[in-house]
Amino acid sequence: MRTVLLVLALSAASAYGQDAGKEIQRYREMVAEGSPAELFELEGETLWKKPQGPKNVSLEKCNLGKGPGVVKGAYAGLPRYFKDADRVMDLETRLLYCMTTLQGRTREEVTKRAFGNADHPSEMESLSAYVAGQSRGIKMAPGVSHPKEKQSIELGRALYFHRVGAWDFSCATCHGDEGKRIRMQELPVLYKPAAARSTAATWPAYRVSTSSFVTLQWRMNDCFRQMRTPEPTFGSETTVALIHFISATGAGATYNGPGNKR
């Protein structure tokens, strides 16, 4: 009898999980129509063209990897190695570089409010929305050939499985097994191409539950916070490497963001 009850319970849980998954997908499709992310894209375009900083220049000569000022398809090619900075950069790290070198602003000024909220979105978030949106429909192809790109991806892979902090958590603790959820939120297994493609193709994103636009640097930072470890420096080698590993694993996906998240 106990065996029968256990089988019934497991079957019910499985059915519930499948139904919940369908409802979550339906919900995402509904909120994708007329996404508020479009408003952040528009604001980001304004900021891209706005003269700022001690040098009073815009970001229109910022080289995101496709040449000075070229935003079309740039996000799809990130993270990648930049010779002028001699390091691998993701979108936000590169924007920070351009703000400091082209506009003459300080790192402290730019990163003071790198992450905004519903009432006060950050400049970095809006710029990320604009640049990312210019890769819509383009296949994701982050840099993977330069020696420092290869090092970055391997570092990201090692960090993904590295346990740390008081709770002895790693990224794989939550994102390591199929079918895991936190409440109604599915936890994709990001070291597998299928899940990584879905993630790479939709970030950055508008977060419905907080009415705010969030970026991958924010996502990495918040994961470290939830693991009860010190939050990383904005644009650190650690966060860029993790983003690079996930992006490289998900290479080939057609970018369809900025997306919508719970």
Can you name each region flagged by the protein language model?
Residues I138-L155:
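Solvent-exposed, charged amphipathic helical/linker segments at domain boundaries
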Residues L127-V131, G143-V144:
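Hydrophobic, well-structured mid-protein blocks that either form specific transmembrane helices
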Residues L8-G17:
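Hydrophobic h-region of N-terminal signal peptides that target proteins for export
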Residues Q18-L39, K49-S126, R136-G137, H162-R262:
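Electron-transfer interface patches adjacent to heme c in soluble/periplasmic c-type cytochromes
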Residues M1-V7:
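Sec-dependent signal peptide recognition
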Residues L159:
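Secondary-shell segments that build the walls of catalytic and ion/ligand-binding clefts
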Residues L39-F40, Q151:
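An amphipathic alpha-helix/helix-turn recognition signal
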